[in-house]
Regions:
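Acidic, glycine-rich flexible loop segments
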Residues: 112-113
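N-terminal pre-ligand scaffold of iron-sulfur
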Residues: 18-91, 105-106, 119-138
Length: 138
């Protein structure tokens, strides 16, 4: 009976580990966005968001929210192995995974519509107001 208990605990532990699996991979991110650059001047306004290609796993989204600047990897947190890049909704409040239909809030990266259950991968945003630029890194 003791061995049965140990076997059940081990079986549960092994199967639970498999469910933790799919997360957005860690990649080095470190770049500067000049807010004077015409591609990014909209970020001066609260409620704006832009995409930046060639960084992160599937690109980066940078947004100016009521709580400040945020940055997320565009790689969907739902089935990230598919590398589906989320897109910014017209209202600039949500992003959508075109592969699954999942949605996340830009404000904090939390899931807003199933099947997503994990938040978007966030990056750190440093603001240098005197030089008018943002640094995004991890």
């Amino acid at each position: 009976m003791k061995w049965l208990g140990i076997a059940l605990v081990l079986l549960f532990a092994v199967s639970a580990c498999g469910k933790q699996g799919n997360v957005v991979p860690n990649v080095a991110v470190n770049f500067i966005l000049q807010l004077n650059d015409p591609r990014y001047t909209s970020l001066r306004s609260i409620g704006s968001a832009v995409t930046v290609d060639n960084y992160g796993v599937a690109g980066i989204i940078v947004a100016n929210t009521v709580n400040g600047y945020v940055a997320y990897d565009r790689c969907s947190a739902y089935e990230p192995e598919k590398r589906c890049a989320v897109t910014i909704d017209d209202n600039k409040l949500l992003v959508t995974d075109p592969c699954s239909g999942s949605k996340w809030l830009l404000q904090d990266g939390t899931p807003n519509k199933a099947p997503a259950v994990r938040s978007l991968k966030a990056y750190i945003v440093y603001i240098d107001a005197s030089r008018n630029y943002l640094t995004v890194s991890n």
